[in-house]
């Protein structure tokens, strides 16, 4: 049985050291989370699986790690300075602020229908309704009042202001003088660093079309209403690819990446049947998008929410950042750029003439991936003896701890010395973290490692060192290996243990 509430998952994450509230000892900071000892391991394993699949296992990909703070001109010409905003609305009764679409989505169906009726829109076309509310702010606030839109915090009908745009980028000052010439932004997405480094990568690697640039890194969005644990946060981490293709081949590559990404999620334990593919309606597309597929995972505690977007960005991005735009025959409509000093073109693979490539962008959030993987792995089981156990049935390559080595008696050197030697040998295999667990209570150790998803527990006992009562000589120099999922226990020779573990975890 999966987690039945977000609270259940949050409780496990804190109790077992996966995720903590940011700045918790000062009351916490909304939309910011810290990853604990096991959380950072799981997060790193997810990122490693993504990097291995998309960089190491392909011949057409390069990596990049661009800076977090960006020149304001980058985000001006990318369109973010003008368009990276959401309509917000305030309740004057309690000074609470909400994102317009989130507030409306939280209302009962009859309230939504009433708002739509007043605005002359259909409640079935939510995006068009939100667009109408944003376009007519005075009418929107009146519609909210007449329809009785309630404040999610107080539960009472609010006194709503006119909605107004709120730019979600974090602005910062660069250098010692704070003026209008010295500001920049924390990047709202990792993509722009890839586009501005396009020429550097091409020149240094001699890449030809098609090829991609992959990046994992932090991005920052000043969300109006961060919520649902790590699903919607203000500091996030992204795994993004910008895959550059010859114009005219973009639709074929779009389908290629859709299938590739669905397979990757399946390999991480997120079943394909739990992911709906949303072909984003034209009116909902981002300003740069020709077409976008959103992968909507059915979170057990949230319902269907976006886990990844796969966008056909056409030639918008490189076209926006390049000089000499008028000479390049761009398909996308871009603002004139007199600030860039680079011509972001590449030889066409057939004609050898300079061309601005189209871009296919698979973009996934590490935090949302964490939440999906944890949600899918979280299992409550009733054992044969009637006891209940919680177990994280993580894929072994994602498990924060691969193996726990447990001495049955922590005060007996004969046993602890063998356990420590086994731990050192297994750690040397390079499979991930191996933990020496000397809590002293084997039952509690098993339960703890079930909850954190450790695939195998290796127990060194008295039989291992020939000190057990009526010890069977065949048990000497063997250990008990317990399987997390089946609870089966098997005696394995110490001399064969490393190979046994390698075969199971690889």
From Swiss-Prot:
InterPro entries per record: aa-tRNA-synt_IIb, aa-tRNA-synth_II, aa-tRNA-synth_II/BPL/LPL, Anticodon-bd, Anticodon-bd_dom_sf, Gly-tRNA_synthase/POLG2, Gly_tRNA_ligase_bac, GlyRS-like_core
GO biological process: glycyl-tRNA aminoacylation
Compartments (UniProt record): Cytoplasm
CDD domains recorded: GlyRS-like_core (cd00774), GlyRS_anticodon (cd00858)
Keyword Acetylation among UniProt keywords: no
Primary localisation category: cytoplasm
Amino acids binding ATP: 221-223, 231-236, 306-307, 365-368
GO molecular function: ATP binding; glycine-tRNA ligase activity; protein dimerization activity
Quaternary organization: Homodimer.
Positions bound to substrate: 99, 189, 236-240, 361-365
Keyword Nucleotide-binding attributed: yes
Pfam families given in the database record: HGTP_anticodon, tRNA-synt_2b
GO CC list: cytoplasm
Reaction equations catalysed: tRNA(Gly) + glycine + ATP = glycyl-tRNA(Gly) + AMP + diphosphate
EC number: 6.1.1.14
Similarity comment: Belongs to the class-II aminoacyl-tRNA synthetase family.
PROSITE patterns the UniProt entry points to: AA_TRNA_LIGASE_II (PS50862)
Transmembrane segments: none
Protein purpose: Catalyzes the attachment of glycine to tRNA(Gly).
Source organism (scientific name): Deinococcus radiodurans (strain ATCC 13939 / DSM 20539 / JCM 16871 / CCUG 27074 / LMG 4051 / NBRC 15346 / NCIMB 9279 / VKM B-1422 / R1)
Keywords, alphabetical: Aminoacyl-tRNA synthetase, ATP-binding, Cytoplasm, Ligase, Nucleotide-binding, Protein biosynthesis
Record PANTHER family: DNA POLYMERASE SUBUNIT GAMMA-2, MITOCHONDRIAL (PTHR10745:SF8), GLYCYL-TRNA SYNTHETASE/DNA POLYMERASE SUBUNIT GAMMA-2 (PTHR10745)
Protein name in the entry: Glycine--tRNA ligase
Source domain of life: Bacteria
């Amino acid at each position: 049985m999966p987690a039945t509430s977000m609270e259940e998952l949050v409780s496990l994450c804190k109790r077992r050291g996966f995720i903590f509230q940011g700045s918790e000892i000062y009351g916490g900071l909304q939309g910011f989370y810290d990853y604990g000892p096991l959380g950072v391991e799981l997060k790193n394993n997810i990122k490693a699986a993504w990097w291995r699949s998309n960089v190491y296992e392909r011949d057409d990909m390069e990596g990049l790690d661009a800076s977090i703070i960006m020149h304001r001109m980058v985000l001006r010409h990318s369109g973010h300075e003008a368009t990276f905003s959401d309509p917000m609305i305030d309740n004057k009764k309690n000074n609470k602020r909400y994102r317009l679409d989130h507030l409306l989505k939280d209302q009962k169906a009859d309230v939504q229908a009433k708002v739509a009726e007043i605005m002359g829109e259909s409640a079935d076309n939510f995006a068009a309704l939100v667009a109408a509310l944003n376009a007519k702010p005075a009418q929107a606030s009146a519609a909210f009042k007449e329809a009785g839109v309630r404040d999610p915090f107080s539960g009472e009908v609010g006194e709503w202001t006119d909605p107004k745009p709120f730019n979600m980028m974090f602005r910062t000052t660069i250098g010692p003088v704070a003026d209008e010439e010295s500001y920049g932004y924390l990047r709202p997405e990792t993509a722009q660093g890839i586009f501005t480094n396009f020429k550097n990568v091409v020149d240094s690697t001699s890449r030809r079309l098609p090829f991609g640039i992959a990046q994992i890194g932090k991005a920052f969005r000043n969300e109006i209403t961060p919520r649902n644990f790590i699903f919607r946060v203000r500091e996030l981490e992204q795994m993004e690819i910008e895959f550059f293709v010859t114009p005219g081949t973009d639709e074929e590559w779009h389908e290629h990446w859709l299938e590739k990404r669905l397979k990757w999620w399946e390999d991480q334990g997120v079943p394909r049947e739990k992911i709906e593919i949303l072909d984003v309606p034209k009116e909902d597309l981002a300003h740069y998008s020709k077409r976008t597929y959103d992968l909507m995972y059915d979170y057990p505690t949230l319902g269907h929410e976006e886990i990844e977007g796969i966008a056909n960005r056409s030639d918008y991005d490189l076209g926006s950042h390049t000089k000499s735009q008028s000479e390049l025959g761009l398909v996308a409509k871009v603002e004139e750029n007199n600030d860039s000093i680079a011509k972001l073109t590449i030889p066409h693979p057939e004609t050898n003439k300079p061309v601005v490539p189209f871009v296919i962008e698979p973009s996934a959030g590490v935090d949302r991936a964490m939440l999906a993987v944890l949600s899918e792995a979280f299992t409550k089981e009733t054992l044969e003896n009637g006891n209940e156990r919680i177990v994280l049935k993580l894929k072994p390559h994602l498990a924060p701890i691969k193996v726990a080595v447990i001495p049955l008696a922590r005060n007996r050197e004969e046993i602890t010395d063998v356990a420590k030697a086994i731990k050192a040998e297994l750690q040397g295999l390079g499979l991930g973290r191996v933990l020496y667990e000397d809590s002293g209570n084997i039952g509690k150790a098993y339960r703890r490692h079930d909850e954190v998803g450790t695939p195998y527990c290796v127990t060194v006992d008295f039989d291992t060192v020939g000190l057990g009562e009526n010890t069977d000589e065949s048990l000497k120099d063997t250990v008990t290996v317990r399987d997390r999922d089946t609870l089966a226990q098997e005696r394995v020779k110490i001399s064969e243990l490393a190979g046994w573990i390698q075969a199971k975890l690889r």
